[in-house]
């Protein structure tokens, strides 16, 4: 999901 991608980037 988008949230997962954002969390991975952080």
From Swiss-Prot:
Write out the tissue specificity statement of the associated record. Nacreous layer of shell.
**Domain of life of the organism encoding this protein:** Eukaryota
Name of the protein in question: Uncharacterized protein IMPP4
């Amino acid at each position: 999901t988008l949230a997962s991608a954002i969390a991975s980037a952080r």
